[in-house]
């Protein structure tokens, strides 16, 4: 099996933690590095959360801090979902794990420039790090094999009626990425909301056990409450983990090629991913957009990754 080389760019975040857990353990993925961006919470908090997850699960992958602010807009956070720390719920041991000194954007540029064009970028937060890397060094564009991202929606948003949080947090960055010409795969809310993590799924991961089962339970029990309070959902979707699922086996997720444009005009549609589902604009498709996911397969995959952390001495 070919191992997909990836850089995971994230803003941990409850579902980000699940994505890290899966990407670091599954044999189909070669996780080269984790880059952190501000998003669900401010950068100082998302960085600590990423380091905590890596320390708890003994994930020995370098972690790099990136953009603390969006490119243009005033910063927003998703504390209504992720809490004051950005990863409320689990209790971690005192943190000894440290981030690398290199800036995430420099790491992304240097790693891509030294590569053979075989690295996939997996941004599951606001696209600030990726967009700044593209603007700082446009020569990286042909080096990117593919960008598999979590963000947007072809239907309704979740932070405004039009916009999904990751895109709304930095629409200008998203505009840079969606006009880059790099092959894009978008896991938007229409798909990711199919991965609602109900109490029976949490119980299944608890039964699977080990440090990842425990962390999954602590994390997803917290979002049970916030997702119901905010959106009336029966649990928290693991939005970001769908990108890892797609990379492991794209057959589990049905996609449709569409032309996608990010609205950066101020107004009620600011941050909307305008997806030309019917092809009415006549513009060539630039994105594979996730439509449906085989949830039985997906939760089986999550459980497989959880079990991978159980120590056998």
Swiss-Prot record:
InterPro entries: I/U_nuclsd_hydro_CS, Inosine/uridine_hydrolase_dom, IUNH, Pyrim_hydro_RihB, Ribo_hydro-like. Its EC number is 3.2.2.8. Ca(2+) binds at residues 11, 16, 124, 240. One of its GO terms (cellular component) is cytosol. The active site is at residue 11. Gene3D superfamilies: Ribonucleoside hydrolase-like. It comes from the Bacteria. Substrate binds at residues 227, 239. Hydrolyzes cytidine or uridine to ribose and cytosine or uracil, respectively. Has a clear preference for cytidine over uridine. Strictly specific for ribonucleosides. This is Pyrimidine-specific ribonucleoside hydrolase RihB.
